[in-house]
Amino acid sequence: MFEVEYLIKDCDDVNKNTLEQEFQDLNIEDWKWDAATGQLIVKGSVSPSKVLRRLENATSKPILIRGASNKESGVSILYEANEDITQIPKVYGLCRFIPTEEKIFLDLIATQLLPNREYTGLVTISGDISRGLKSAGDSLVTLFNANSNEQGKIVLDKEVSGSLPNWIGHCFVLKCVDDSDSATMGIISRSAGLGQNTKQICACTGKSLWTEHAELKSVNEGSSCCSKKDSSPSEKPSCCSQEKKSCCSSKKPSCCSQEKKGCCSTEKTSCCSQEKKSCCTSEKPSCCSNGKSTVCA
């Protein structure tokens, strides 16, 4: 069990009954809501990311995780494991490290990975990410193995053994078991506990927390590696194959937006369910435009 502090933006019209229903569905009984400030404190064993997604969907409001646990927590923003320090690193996700009574609760979301592959999560002996895996060093402790889905995404919540204070300042690495070139990594930094985070502007970027939240959310909900602008056809995995009838194209972005529920499957599932218009023809995927189906690949 652990406590997590959330902040809901523009909370004036948030219905408390809506929150209560979501917490009932998640089997969470201990929570406190301050309608004046938008502060929400939740105690339970459900991953913070899962709670956040449920509440954002239910309230249609942006929500921040402001702090977790009364003990020292940690967080690692996952970047591309790139040896070229002159490039601006891409963000691949985030992993939270939340101490419980006896273990450490991991709350991980990683995107843009190779689809349907096994990945290992580990802490390395170094905290140097300047040259990617080369500077991170060998493994200090292996935390878990997990498989990416067809979209190249891993969502994981898991308790592991270890001492978080001994990991602070080290690298957290998520790397593919059978492809050493596919890896993402970040430094494990201290994060705020309950009531400790009052900042509105990030000192590192100068952006508001809500701006950074929107950017990170777009990464977490992003599509798989088949939508990367700089991906070559040879780099595009099975999610972009003709057999999968994917909407992803090496030349054009996916016709299936986040609102249109992903790529067309072999069962010809509609990508435009909200409009009740199928994006899929019998031969090739298509996209919906102005109420008409137009081929996009």
Swiss-Prot record:
Residues 234-257 have a biased composition (Low complexity). InterPro entries: SOD-like_Cu/Zn_dom_sf (IPR036423). GO terms for cellular component: cytosol; mitochondrial inner membrane; nucleus. Residues 222-263 are annotated as: Disordered. It is found in: Cytoplasm. GO terms for biological process: cellular response to metal ion; intracellular copper ion homeostasis; removal of superoxide radicals. Keywords: Chaperone, Copper, Cytoplasm, Metal-binding. Cu cation binds at residue 11. SUPFAM superfamilies: Cu,Zn superoxide dismutase-like. GO terms for molecular function: copper chaperone activity; metal ion binding; superoxide dismutase copper chaperone activity. Its main location: cytoplasm. Copper chaperone for superoxide dismutase 1 (sod1). Binds copper ions and delivers them specifically to sod1. Also has a role in cell protection against copper ion toxicity during conditions of copper excess. The C-terminal region is thought to act specifically in this sequestration role. Belongs to the CCS1 family. This is Superoxide dismutase 1 copper chaperone. It comes from Schizosaccharomyces pombe (strain 972 / ATCC 24843) (Fission yeast).
